[in-house]
A protein has these predicted regions:
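Alpha-helical recognition segments enriched in aromatics with Gly/Pro capping
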Residues: 1-100
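Feature 926 captures the class I aminoacyl-tRNA synthetase adenylation module centered on the KMSKS loop
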Residues: 18-21, 55-56, 71-173
Length: 173
């Protein structure tokens, strides 16, 4: 009953009245937030604000937490799941720093034959990402495609592979 008619209609009417213009063309509303598999509720005493969660984990971590689930699904908030989101962000940041390092310190010269083949395979990740987003804004699968890309890029651009600056730059871009 929480999100039953006319909840969203009232949100739209209030926003349009306050701002004097059309609200939005697309609007997504995530599922309810559960705390350790129980509905979040002031009456249950398991209520928190976004500011409180951000103080503990950071806003980027909360964003990742939300992106890792489909927007129509309930979100299960727990310390363990927030740590998974934090670790996911750290993997992305580590990959970025790794690419930046090799853009500055990799071998000079053109892409090698192996690197050229790797670069030719990169569009498949964009295709997977776009397919997930086109599938009812499936951010969980889109994030999975990003992490497949990160895994392959980390293998291709590592000290063991002795990459060129050019490969690091292509992957970074």
């Amino acid at each position: 009953a929480d999100l039953a008619f006319p909840h969203h209609e009232n949100e739209i009417a209030q926003s349009e009245a306050a701002n004097g213009c059309e609200f939005v063309h697309y609007w997504l509303h995530n599922g309810f937030i559960n705390i350790d598999n129980k509905k979040m509720s002031k009456s249950l005493g398991n209520f928190f604000t976004v500011r409180e969660a951000a103080a503990a984990y950071g806003y980027d971590c909360i964003r990742m937490f939300m992106l890792m689930s489909h927007y129509r699904s309930p979100l299960n908030y727990s310390g363990e799941i927030l740590m998974q989101a934090k670790n996911a962000l750290e993997r992305l940041n580590t990959a970025k720093k790794n690419l930046e390092f090799f853009m500055a310190n990799g071998k000079d010269g053109e892409l090698t034959e192996t690197e050229t083949a790797f670069v030719a395979a990169l569009p498949k990740f964009r295709e997977k990402f776009c397919a997930a987003m086109d599938d009812d804004f499936n951010t969980a699968d889109a994030i999975a495609a990003i992490f497949e890309l990160v895994r392959d890029v980390n293998a291709a651009v590592s000290p063991a592979s002795d990459p060129t600056k050019a490969l690091a730059k292509v992957c970074y871009d």
